[in-house]
Amino acid sequence: MADENQEIGGIHFPFPFPPYPIQKDFMAELYKVLEGGKIGIFESPTGTGKSLSLICGALSWLRDFEKKKLQAEALLLAPGSGPPSSEKNSLLTSSSCQEPTDTPRPAGEPDWVTEFVQKKEERDLVERLREEQVRRRKREERLKEVCQDGRLRFAAKRTKHEEEETEALLRLSREMLDAGTGPEQLEQLECGEEHLVLAEYESDEERRGSRVDEAEDDLEEEHITKIYYCSRTHSQLAQFVREVLKSPFGKETRLVSLGSRQTLCVNEDVKNLGSVQLMNDRCVDMQRSKREKNGTGEDKPKRKRQKIQTSCPFYNHEQMELLRDEILLEVKDMEQLVALGKEARACPYYGSRFAIPAAQLVVLPYPMLLHAATRQAAGIRLQGQVVIIDEAHNLIDTITNIHSTEVNGSQLCQAHSQLLQYMERYRKRLKAKNLMYIKQILYLLEKFVAVLGGNVKQNPTTQSLSQTGSELKSINDFLFQSQVDNINLFKVQRYLEKSMLSRKLFGFTECFGVVLPSLSDSQENRGLAGFQQFLKSLQSGPTEDSPEEGQAVALRPASPLMHIEAFLAALTTANQDGRVIVNRQGSVGQSSLKFLLLNPAVHFAQVVKECRAVVIAGGTMQPMSDFREQLLACSGVEAGRVVEFSCGHVIPPDNILPLIICSGPSNQQLEFTYQRRELPQMVEETGRILCNLCNVVPGGVVCFLPSYEYLRQVHAHWDKTGLLTRLSVRKKIFQEPKRASQVEQVLMAYSKCIMSCSHSEGHLTGALLLSVVGGKMSEGINFSDDLGRCVVMVGMPYPNIKSPELQEKMAYLNQTLPRTQGQPLPGTVLIENLCMKAINQSIGRAIRHQRDFASIVLLDHRYARPSILAKLPAWIRDRVEVKATFGPAFAAVRKFHREKSHPSLV
C-alpha cells in the first residue's frame, strides 16, 4: 500500500496507510512532548496501532529536529554572519549529548569580561559544529563506500587465513609454556591454572591521573541525537523492528538492536557457559588478555599467566568497525545481526555497541536502559536524548525487581568455602591488597551466615535453626547487626567489579571440581579433595549412580559469589530507599537474605534528568497516578513537565459489552473477598454463572481467577459437585499451567479445539480456558476473534496484604508521599492500584483489532464503586453496564453474541 503523508497541525507525518483519528492525535501529542522536552505518559489500547504511531510520530520529530539543526549550523558557520542570541542558545542546548555551556555571570562583572566570555563561547560552539560536520561527512562517505563495494565480506575472507596462522602460533606457545620453561616459577601449578590468579589490584585513587580505564573512550565518536526505544522482551523488540521496516522510515533510518551476550555472542566456547554472568565475565576476561598481550611490557617482566590466556577471535576492531557500518546501512533484527557477525567473523555484541553513536534509533531491552551499570557498560549516553519505554504498565515493578536481589544460606556458605580454598591455594602469589579484600569478603560472608543463625564451617543443608520466620530491617540496622558496618562496601563492590574475582573463582571451581586420581594421592591437594566433597553436598537435583573407580566426576558449580555481588551492591543503597528481609527457614541452606528496593525513583531519576524527553507508553496504563507520584514526582520531575495522553479504541461502541454483575443466578451476592471466596456457595455460584455464559457465547471463553491455588480449589470443587461435567457439555476445559514451558502447548490445544468446533455442528461450541491473573495468559497473549469472545474476571485480585514486603512498601509510601485531605492513605491506594492494573491487563486481552468483538464480565459487586470504575480504561469505563441481578445480565450477553455472530438473523 502506498505511503500516506499526513499533515497534522502543519507537521507532516508519513504513514503506511490512512491512520485512525486516534493515531493522528497520538502522533501530534507525541511530537509536542518531544519538541517541548516533556515527560509523556501515553495509553493506547492494544489493537489501535500504538507501535506505528510511536514510530511515525517520533521519527517525524527526529527528521524535523535534524533539519532545523543543519539549518542553524549553516547559519552559524556562514562567513561573516552571526546568529541571534536565542538561536545560539537553542543550538547550545539541543546539540547532541552536550551540556548547555551558558552559565550565569557573576553580578558586577565588567562588560568587557562578559563580552569576552560570550565571544569565546561562540567560538567554541563554531569549532564544535565544524568538528561535527566533518564527522558527519566522514560517516556518510564511509557508509556509502561500504554500500557500494561490500568491503565487509571481502575483509572477513582476507583475514581468516591470518587468524588461522595466529591460532597455530598460540598453540605452539602454549605447548612451550606447559613444558615449564621460564625463570619465574614460584611453584608448579596445574595446566591452565595460571589465569586463575588475580592480577595486582589498583584502587581508583591509585589509578587516578594515570588513565588506565577499561573503557575505550578514544574509539568512540560523538553521539548524535537519537531515540532509545525499549520494551520488556526480545520478541516484542523484534516485532517493533519489523514495524519499523514496514513504516515509511524503514529504508532511511539507522537502527541498532542491542541485546545481551546471551543473545548476540557468536563464540561457541563462551555461549556454552550458559549463564549471562559467566558469559559477561569470560568475555571481558578474554579482552583483558588480548590487551595484556598487545602491551609492550618492556618496563615490567611479563607474568606467566599473561602469556597463556586466549583472546576471542571475533573481538577484532577492524572487523567490528566494518560490521558497525553494515549495521547502520539498513535495518536488521537480532537474527540477521548474529548471522552477519558469524559471516564477518566479527562480534555482533560489540559491533552493535560501536554503532550506537551514529544510530538514529536504538532498540534495547528494559534492563539495559534501566540499570545504570549495564547502561554504562553498553556505551549508552542519555544526555539530550529521547527515551521511549513501551509496554510500561509494570514499569515500577520492573525497576524494583531489577534492583532487588536475594541470596540463600547455601550460596553464602559455598562462596565462603570456595574463596577460602582459593586464598589458601594462591596465597603466595597474591599481592597484599588482593589478600586484604579477599579477607574482607570472607568476613562479610561469615557474618551474613551468622545473621541467619548458622556457621560457615558447617554444611548449611544439615544446620537446623531453632528460630524461624521473617525479619525486616533497615539497611543500617542490618549492617550493624551483622557487625560489618565498619567495612567500606563501596570499595569492596568496586574491587569485585575490577578484579573479576567471581570469574576467577568460577574458573577455580571448574579446574578443581573434577576428581582426579592425583588429587587424592597428593598431600598438597587433600584440602581441595575435601572442598570437592563439600561442593558435592551442595549440588541440587537427583543423585546419579556413582562412577567407577578412577573415573572423573564432572562438577560445574558456578561460583555463587557472582550472585552475592549483586546483594553487596544493593547494600550501598541509601538507608531510606531499601530494606533487608532476613528469612529464616528450617535450615541455614533454605534461609535467605533479600534486599527490597522501596524507592524505584532513585534509579529512574538519572534517566529523566539526563534525557531531553521521556515517553512511557502502554496499552493499559490506568491508573496513571502511580507513575506520577511514585516514579516521576519522587524523581524530581515537576508536575508541569508531565503530559498524560489516553485515547479510545478503534472498535465501534457496539462491538464491546462490559458488564458488572453484582449477584448470581441464585441471588447470591458476588463478593470474592479473601474470607468469602472459598465458601462452597460462592464457588458453586461462579460455576453456575459460567455454565450459563458458555451456553450462549460462541468460541472461546477466558476466565481469570485470583491465584493458582484458588484455581485448583475451584476446579476440584466443580469436579466433585458435577459442575465440571455440565461445563464440558458446551466447552472443552483447559487450565493455565504453572510451568511457563507448558503454556504454548496448552494455548495450541485451546486454539485447535475452538477452530475445529467452528467447523462442526456438534454440541461442543468452543473451549473454556481457566487462567490466573498475573500469569502468562494475562500478559502478552492475544485472545483475538474466536479465541476470546468473552472474558470473565472472578473477583478482585488484591495482593496479599500480609506480605512483609508489601507492608513495608505501604509504610514507606505513607511516610514519603503527601496525603490529600479526605483521600485514603497512599499505601491503601497502592493496594487498589496493583489490583486494578492486573485487572486491566487481563481484560485487555480480548479486543485486538477494529473488527473484533467481545463481552467482558466482571463478577463482584465492588466493581460498581465509583473509585474502582474510575480506574478502568476509558474505552471500557464509558461503555460499562452495572447489573444488580443475573437475569438482565445474561439476557444482555445472549443478545450481544446473537447479533454479532448472526447479524443476518437480527
From Swiss-Prot:
A UniProt-annotated Pfam family: DEAD_2
User: Per the annotation, how and in what number is the cofactor bound?
Assistant: Binds 1 [4Fe-4S] cluster.
- UniProt KW Magnesium keyword: no
Q: At which residues is Phosphoserine found?
A: 260
Q: Where is this region: Disordered?
A: 78-111, 284-310
Reaction(s) this enzyme catalyzes, per UniProt? Couples ATP hydrolysis with the unwinding of duplex DNA at the replication fork by translocating in the 5'-3' direction. This creates two antiparallel DNA single strands (ssDNA). The leading ssDNA polymer is the template for DNA polymerase III holoenzyme which synthesizes a continuous strand; ATP + H2O = ADP + phosphate + H(+)
Annotated GO molecular function terms are:
4 iron, 4 sulfur cluster binding; 5'-3' DNA helicase activity; ATP binding; ATP hydrolysis activity; ATP-dependent activity, acting on RNA; catalytic activity, acting on a nucleic acid; chromatin binding; DNA binding
**Span of the annotated motif DEAH box:** 390-393
- The superkingdom of the source organism is Eukaryota
Alphabetical UniProt keywords: 4Fe-4S, Activator, ATP-binding, Cytoplasm, Cytoskeleton, Developmental protein, DNA damage, DNA repair, DNA replication, DNA-binding, Helicase, Hydrolase, Iron, Iron-sulfur, Isomerase, Metal-binding, Nucleotide-binding, Nucleus, Phosphoprotein, RNA-binding, Transcription, Transcription regulation
Q: Where in the cell is it found?
A: Nucleus; Nucleus, Nucleolus; Cytoplasm, Cytoskeleton, Spindle pole; Midbody
Biased composition range(s): Low complexity: 85-96
SMART domains, per the entry: DEXDc2, HELICc2
The record, for InterPro entries, names: ATP-dep_Helicase_C, DinG/Rad3-like, Helic_SF1/SF2_ATP-bd_DinG/Rad3, Helicase-like_DEXD_c2, P-loop_NTPase, RAD3-like_helicase_DEAD, Rad3/Chl1-like
Locate the compositionally biased regions of type Basic and acidic residues: 284-301
Cofactor(s) needed: [4Fe-4S] cluster
Enzyme class name: isomerase
A Gene Ontology cellular component where this protein is annotated is:
chromatin
Binding residues for [4Fe-4S] cluster, per the UniProt record? 265, 283, 312, 347
| Gene3D superfamilies registered for this protein in UniProt | P-loop containing nucleotide triphosphate hydrolases
What the record says about disrupting the gene is: Embryonic death at 10.5 dpc. Embryos are smaller in size, malformed and exhibit sparse cellularity in comparison to normal or heterozygous litter mates. Show inability to form a proper embryonic placenta. Display high incidence of cell aneuploidy due to abnormal chromosomal segregation. Show abnormal formation and localization of heterochromatin.
Positions of the Helicase ATP-binding domain: 9-442
EC numbers: 5.6.2.3
Q: How does it assemble?
A: Associates with the CTF18-RFC complex. Associates with a cohesin complex composed of RAD21, SMC1 proteins and SMC3. Interacts with CHTF18. Interacts with DSCC1. Interacts with FEN1; this interaction is direct and increases flap endonuclease activity of FEN1. Interacts with PCNA. Interacts with POLR1A and UBTF. Interacts with RAD21, SMC1 proteins and SMC3. Interacts with RFC2. Interacts with TIMELESS; this interaction increases recruitment of both proteins onto chromatin in response to replication stress induction by hydroxyurea.
Please report which protein family the annotation says this sequence is part of.
Belongs to the DEAD box helicase family. DEAH subfamily. DDX11/CHL1 sub-subfamily.
Annotated protein name in UniProt: ATP-dependent DNA helicase DDX11
Q: Which organism is it from?
A: Mus musculus
